[in-house]
Regions:
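Generic C-terminus detector
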Residues: 549-590
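Glycine-rich oxoanion-binding loops at beta->alpha junctions
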Residues: 70-83, 265-279, 303-339, 479-495
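Glycine-rich phosphate-binding loops that contact phosphosugars or nucleotide phosphates
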Residues: 283-424, 458, 505-547, 565
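Short helix-capping/linker segments at secondary-structure and domain boundaries
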Residues: 12-13, 134-140, 167-169, 409-418, ...
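Acidic/histidine-rich
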Residues: 153-187, 448-474, 509, 516
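Short, solvent-exposed amphipathic alpha-helical segments in soluble enzyme
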Residues: 20-24, 85, 114, 175-178, ...
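Conserved short alpha-helical segments that host acidic/polar catalytic motifs at enzyme active sites
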Residues: 1-246, 250, 255-259, 265-266, ...
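Active-site phosphate/pyrophosphate-binding segments
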Residues: 253, 259-289, 379-501, 573-590
Length: 590
């Protein structure tokens, strides 16, 4: 899992690549590297650590040239070392490669290639430059050698290659891993996503599975893996680049938390006709299945409740990574709703491919227009919440909920009413941000030494217990467990002891009496209770106030307090909430 970028133009590559990698840092990484091409030589700089530190250690003057590639890496094959950082080169340092994905047949290839060429790393990626070199040594020109090598690779990959044997050119290939071109005047880019090149061009071309591209600074040509040319129209990227900056905030996470009232209002700008058409299709489907991972799965669980309570339609939620094991009943009468912020999540993409192979209709809820998932879907709804840079989902989660509410209200013929209610909710969230932040920061301080947290809720808020626990795990590195409160006595109660923090989501809806009873059981065992409710209760040691709303809307007024609790808990522990260890924003491998 990583971010990749390739540049060819008329300006020195290193600063452009460095800045591009900085914009890709949000994807998560443990090492970084750059290779440039100049005067018949590949210049290489790579190491474990942050982009700025890696480049500083190498000295920019040692990376000349107007063609280059850059990489930020999360280790999947090989430990975190300089040797395993990208780019990887052939033995003569004439070919440099960066790669996102997993080469599934790398052991077979390595066993063959190691008889001819010396390997320097433990990664699967290093087979690629040696494989290209093997084809060159067999007598092929470099371009033909590149295509011959790509055809031998199995697995998922987005690769970019430069070589002294093809000066001034970039070569790239994609299979099951995102790739997009940035087309400018006397400059071209290829990378993982548009943020990497957005300051330089807004014209983009999305590369599909099974395609390669050959680029110079003023031309590009797309091919299939058999080297047959293909045509593709470009699209204009409308994202505001300023949204990808922190502004006056110390972290992206708190900036994106505070953007959520505006995000809800933006979500209400959806096309009513499309929402109504999609609602009709949902109602006509024999079965409706949500497919998602992580925070998106918790949004789907809430969507299931809202579809039932408001839309009077049963649906199911299956983890994307498990979908293939439960897809026996999927057929042409199935509607799959795939949810992914990036639109590139590998497990979701794999599930969608399986669903489409069985004839299912696929709708997607995504943030990134032009993403792989949106292009694969029969219809797509866009979150339109702007770039989300913090690794932990915040505003994208809330935007996902809003679109699910809109679909449910459209299913019940009350779309306009649903929009009016959500507009009211956005104002209530804004008030909560103004009134609760200081109190929540104080609560985080009180619990900064705790290592185990339990989040309890019932009904529609059950998924919020899971989401709250996930946020705390992601940014604070503590054990946190979200569960239906009724399950507490079926095992987890054995873990409650004196001082154990229990976060209870218990608005005064139809679940109130039951969850108060469950909390009381925890209190008797010594739990310290943080209550999130519209009313205080004697069982609470700490109270985070939320407004009173209709039962189905409590997740929307609960989400911000949970996010703030996680954010401030990270801050008081001295952690960077934007870059949780071991996690990536866009999980593009299975």
């Amino acid at each position: 899992m990583c971010g990749i970028i390739g540049y060819v133009g008329d300006k020195p590559a290193v600063e452009i690549l460095k800045n591009a990698l900085t914009r890709l840092e949000y994807r998560g990484y443990d090492s970084a590297g750059i290779a440039t091409l100049d005067n018949g030589k590949v210049h290489l700089c790579k190491n474990k650590g942050k982009v700025a530190d890696v480049i500083a250690d190498c000295n920019i003057k040692n990376l000349p040239g107007c063609t280059g590639i850059g990489h930020v890496r999360w280790a999947t094959h090989g430990t975190v070392t300089r040797e395993n950082a990208h780019p990887h080169c052939d033995a003569s340092t004439e070919i440099a490669v960066i790669h996102n994905g997993i080469i599934e047949n790398y052991e077979e290839l390595k066993n063959r290639l190691a008889k001819k060429y010396k390997f320097q790393s433990d990664t699967d990626t290093e087979v690629i430059p040696h494989l290209i070199r093997e084809q060159v040594d067999s007598g092929l020109n470099f371009e033909d050698a590149f295509f011959a090598a790509v055809r031998q690779l199995q697995g998922s990959f987005a690769i970019i290659v430069i070589s002294t044997l093809a000066d001034g050119k970039l070569f790239a290939a994609r299979k099951d891993s995102p790739m997009v071109l940035g087309i400018g005047k006397d400059v071209n880019f290829v990378g993982s996503d548009v943020l990497s090149f957005l300051p330089y061009t807004r014209e983009a071309v999305y590369i599909e599975d099974g395609e390669c591209v050959v680029m110079t600074k003023n031309s590009f040509q797309i091919y299939d893996f058999d080297h047959h040319p293909k045509q593709r129209a470009s699209v204009n990227i409308t994202w505001d680049l300023s949204e990808a900056g922190k502004g006056d905030y110390p972290h992206f996470m708190i900036k994106e938390i505070k953007e959520q009232p505006a995000v809800i209002r933006q979500a209400l700008m959806q096309d009513d006709r499309q929402l109504n058409r999609m609602a009709i299709d949902i109602l006509r489907s024999r079965q409706v299945i949500f497919v998602a991972c992580g925070s998106s799965r918790f949004a789907a669980l809430i969507g299931r409740y809202v579809f039932s309570k408001v839309g009077h339609t049963f649906s199911d939620v299956i983890m994307a990574s498990e979908f293939g094991y439960f897809s026996d009943s999927v057929d042409k009468n199935t509607l799959v709703i795939a949810i992914s912020q990036s639109g590139e999540t590998a497990d979701v993409m794999n599930g969608v491919k399986q669903a489409k192979a069985k004839g299912a209709t696929v709708y997607s809820i995504v943030n990134v227009e032009g993403s792989s998932l949106s292009r694969m879907s029969d219809k797509a709804l866009y979150l339109s919440c702007g770039p989300e840079i913090g690794v932990a989902a915040t505003k994208s989660f809330t935007a996902q909920l809003c679109l699910l509410y809109l679909l449910a209200y459209a299913m019940d013929g009350r779309l306009i009413e649903g929009k009016e209610k959500l507009l009211e909710i956005s104002s209530l969230i804004e008030e909560g941000l103004q009134n609760n932040t200081t109190e929540i920061a104080a609560i985080a301080e009180k619990f900064k030494d705790k290592k185990d947290f339990y989040f309890l809720a019932r009904g529609i808020n059950f998924a919020m217990a899971g989401e709250g626990a996930l946020k705390l795990k992601e940014v604070c590195y503590v054990h946190a467990e979200g569960m239906a409160a009724g399950e507490l006595k079926h095992g987890t109660l054995a873990l409650i002891e004196d001082g154990t923090p229990v976060v209870a989501i218990c608005p005064t809806d139809y679940t109130y009496a039951d969850i108060v009873s469950n909390i009381s059981e925890a209190v008797v065992r010594g739990a310290t209770v943080i209550g999130i409710s519209n009313t205080n209760h004697s069982v609470f040691n700490e109270w985070i106030k939320i407004p009173e709303v209709e039962m189905v809307f409590y997740p929307l007024v609960t989400v911000v307090p949970l996010q703030l609790l996680a954010y401030h808990s990270a801050i008081v522990r001295g952690l960077d909430p934007d870059k949780p260890r071991n996690l990536a924003k866009s999980v593009t491998v299975k």
